Amino acid sequence: MLPRLVTRPMSAKVLALSVGGASFIVFSGAIPVQASSGPALRPVGAAPAVPAGARALGPGRASERLTFDLVLRPRTGRRLRAFAAAVSTPGSAAYRHFLSTAQFAARFGQPRAVVASVDAALRGVGLAPGPVSANHLVIPVATTVGRARVILRTGFERYRLASGRLALANTSAPRLPAAVAHLTQAVLGLDNMTVAAPAATRRPRDRRQASPAARAVPAVIGPQPCRAAVRAARRYRAWTYNQLARAYSLTGRAAQGREGAGVTVGLFEQQPWRASDITEFQACYGTGVPISTVKVDGGAGRGPGPTAETVLDIETVIALAPRAALDVYEAPAGNFAKSSLDEYTRIVDDDQAQVLSTSYGVCESLVKLGAPGLIASENTVFEQAAAEGMSVFAASGDTGSEACEQSSKRLKELSVQDPASQPFVTGVGGTDLTAIGPAPAERVWNDARFGGGAGGGGISSVWRMPSWQAGPGVVNRYSSGRPCHHARGYCREVPDISASANPERGYAIVYKGHWIGEGGTSAAAPLCAALLTDIISGLSPAARAGFLNPLLYSLPKGTLNDIRKGNNDYTRTHHGRYPATRWFDLASGLGSPIATSLAEALRRPS
């Protein structure tokens, strides 16, 4: 559904915006501020929408510290997009000829002279820019609310949100010197209205037990659990990781016995975690995966709330790729737009990880309203990731075809989640794995009856269907160009692939010293990342697979498990949209992975 603008009698030129039955407040026009002499100023972006139920508390305190990002446009955006696609497409002359971060900056980042001129212009109006990012595209700027009010010509308002959280937001688009505005893609971090939700879901009415002492059990196949994990799996009807490995054919043949050796996995996190949980889990599985923690913008802090998200991601990769290295990146959840971009930028600029998994996201329409400019800025970073050969997996969300419902129960319109819908990201949906083999028995995960969640999937309202998204089932009776305003074609469809996600048959993990069962597409995404890690470690030598989707959509029949049962209409308000069908569908994508088949495809010369 497209946003519907309606006017209401409010002060200071305020518009009420209605999206899918929920209201947001948008300030139109800047609150008058002190005028200052200097260069001509131009607006960049827009003010964030304020969710209905938020209560204004008055102007932001002038002394409050504020740090925002000035995001520069890539030097040649179209060429970057073309290169990112070519380097990822089998048969292309550029296939797998990846760049380093320095090469990317030299080719697609802004030149040093341009960055220096932007720095000088910002200092000239009284701002304090920091060092540009390694890709030459992000400049952090430190100031105060009072100075930003005057320099950027925007008001700042404090709010108490319906959740009780305090927030700050600019009330109009920031204004920058014209020469700087021309080079700027977005200004991120002037507000903290939006918080990303991790797509981790616990088994309803879950009960925890104290962790018994870890003891080894005889090896069967893949990573081997201790008795504590086996007992927990039985109690919570959860899978142990050796069972998951078997379900997706993650055997010695797929990984050539290397189990992730020589490969680094990056994890995007915004939740705190306890090292003692990981120590206990590694003792159970007999692993010794080295973990490096990289704090971005000060680290995760307390996070938006207690969840098992980070340990779920870490333990999944540890168990399924036990000889890989693991880099856990952490950023605070409070300033969603800035923290997310800073963290993705740091991961890709560091260029240490060959594979990246993220389980965080927000539905596209709420990102567009609450964090204007973030989706486009993320896209540039994911194009950079593809150019550097980094494979990115993102959870598609746990509220089925109604992604916005994860943020508000009132938002039941058809929607998908960012960043899973990004055109240079592999979106991972959810299945209900009921038997492990020899061929796994799976259907689309949808626990609508008991409110346990459903695998995210549907049609993007932002992105057009990429050229690589083609093949049987891709253009179907639900395909449309309307959501993304594409009059002559179709919009991007997600997910791309799926894996076990039902928390009723979740993953047995250690969290806060207890064994629990955890699921969601937050489990499926790191599972797929670990699976690819094992596969590329078995290549000779260990290599980067790069952005995986062009290869995935070109694979022949039988390379993935085709999911043909169920639908992801989580709220039961869309007549079963979207159902699983033969071939690709909007509930499970291309299906779930078969590691041995994918390994063979990646070993073929192109």
Please name every model-derived segment.
Residues 439-461:
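Short, surface-exposed polybasic-and-hydrophobic patches located at secondary-structure transitions
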Residues 1-35:
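Secretory targeting and sorting signals
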Residues 136-138:
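A generic structural signal for beta-strand entry/edge sites
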Residues 306-309, 344-345, 440-447, 576:
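Short, surface-exposed amphipathic charged segments that create phosphate/polyanion-binding patches used
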Residues 36-131, 140, 145-427, 454, ...:
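Substrate-binding/charge-relay-adjacent region of secreted/lumenal peptidase catalytic domains
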Residues 531:
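Walker A/P-loop NTP-binding active-site region of P-loop NTPases
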Residues 291-292, 393, 427-430, 435-442, ...:
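Acidic/polar loop patches that form or flank catalytic/metal-binding clefts of enzymes
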Residues 8, 482-486, 536-586, 606:
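An often Trp-containing, charged/polar helix-loop segment at the C-terminal end
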